[in-house]
Amino acid sequence: MFRGNFETSIDAKGRTSLPAKFREVLVDSFGDERFFMTNSNPVRLGDGGYSSGLVIYPYNEWLALEEKLKVGTGLGLSSAELASVKRRIVAPAVECVADKLGRILVPPHLRKSACLEREILFVGMLNKAEIWSQAEWEKVFRQDIENFPIDSPVLAELGL
């Protein structure tokens, strides 16, 4: 599973390094070095705005997600909502693999949508990983504090 936060940088051409731990997880936990990169779900901020990063799905996790979205039934989404998800998440997705040195290329359309300019952060999210600009991550992390389910019986049950 993907765990931890890793600060790094991205250059003007969109090159960055996938953390070594994440490369290991792709192969050891998911059996494939390939992955898909796309926009993450937008996060609603307290000021009424939105923030978004990128998300990395292991290859087979992505294929399973595509199948669910292709069928579309039983997801609880209207046809307009499903179309929005497909346009926002599926359409910009790119298949990737890190080179021997662990470098990946983030395409311009994804860099732009996630506001990735220089300092970035890889965030482990168990079965997927996220990529955020440092500035956007700080906004989202502050919002997470607001959204955190304090005194939740579910969290207590989990031991959190």
From Swiss-Prot:
Source organism superkingdom: Bacteria
Coiled-coil features, chain-numbered ranges: none
Membership in a protein family: Belongs to the MraZ family.
Assembly mode: Forms oligomers.
Keyword Coiled coil recorded: no
Organism from which the protein derives: Geotalea daltonii (strain DSM 22248 / JCM 15807 / FRC-32) (Geobacter daltonii)
Record protein name field: Transcriptional regulator MraZ
GO molecular function, one term: transcription cis-regulatory region binding
CDD domains in alphabetical order: MraZ_C, MraZ_N
Disulfide bonds: none
Keywords in alphabetical order: Cytoplasm, DNA-binding, Repeat, Transcription, Transcription regulation
Gene Ontology biological process terms from the UniProt entry: negative regulation of DNA-templated transcription initiation
Domain SpoVT-AbrB: 5-50, 93-136
HAMAP family linked: MraZ (MF_01008)
Record-linked InterPro entries: MraZ (IPR003444), MraZ_C (IPR035644), MraZ_dom (IPR020603), MraZ_N (IPR035642), MraZ_sf (IPR038619), SpoVT-AbrB_dom (IPR007159), SpoVT-AbrB_sf (IPR037914)
Major subcellular location class: cytoplasm
Locations listed in the record: Cytoplasm, Nucleoid
Gene Ontology cellular-component annotations: cytoplasm; nucleoid
